[in-house]
Amino acid sequence: MTVLPLQRGILYGPIDSRRLGKSLGINLMPRNYKLCSFNCVYCHYGLTDKCTMDLGKYVKDLPQFDDVVRAVEQAAKSSMVFDYLTFSGNGEPTLHPRFADLVDEVVRIRDLHRPRVKVALLSNSTGLVYRSVRDSIPKIDLPVFKLDSGRGGKFKAMNRPAREVHFREVLDRLMSLGNICLQTVLIDGTPSNVGKEELSAYFKHVSRIKPREVHIYSIDRPVPNSKISLISPKELEKIALQGRRETGVEIRAFYVR
């Protein structure tokens, strides 16, 4: 199956997001190859070319600080309509060495030119090992962190993380934060994260993390693995209801209507 092409610029969109309305994406990763700390089986950008937490060799390929600031400022001053400025893109945005500084600048530009626009982050949670990233999270209106699995083995099978990434550490960092959202991709097939035991373990972690809400959804775009399949809207709603009952957390299902 053909996957989606990588984003070729610093900014992309605005795209119509099921969760964010009109979202103007900010891509902090390379344009010509996929650099990420995960190699998820369901990623619509395809397989990860460089799966690592260490960006030392790749810094020269990252968007430069001044270029990102300039692009965001130009968009903020334009007539473009958008509801969110969203750190996302071709890989994990929090791995950019100046991520925290860029959060400060994007918030400053937003406050000056687009005070009604919110700033969002879509993250796979691995960058939380860095203190500067953790300190920047309260400045973001909607920080959304990935948790796809309830157990370490399934985490490795679904997200296929860089060798430096450990499931227990990701959980500990998520539990140390407050006022965040979680996002979870649910899939069936090989691998699957919707089995009874897997969901039970997952809901226990959600209860401990205590996010403001959880967004669950399935695949609706091309993926690199033909052995996985989507979860129906009816099943997503059923899982969301089960999760709300077991955790007391607001869990919302998103899907194409």
Stretches with model-predicted labels:
Residues 1-19, 30, 52, 70, ...:
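Auxiliary Fe-S-binding modules of radical SAM enzymes
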Residues 4-8, 27, 87-90, 166-171:
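Generic detector of contiguous secondary-structure segments
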Residues 9-46, 84-86:
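N-terminal pre-triad scaffold of radical SAM enzymes
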Residues 15-17, 34, 112, 136, ...:
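Sterically constrained small-residue positions within well-ordered secondary structures
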Residues 22, 36, 115-117, 249:
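Residue-level signal for beta-strand positions within conserved beta-sheet cores that form or flank
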Residues 42-139:
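Conserved Radical SAM active-site core
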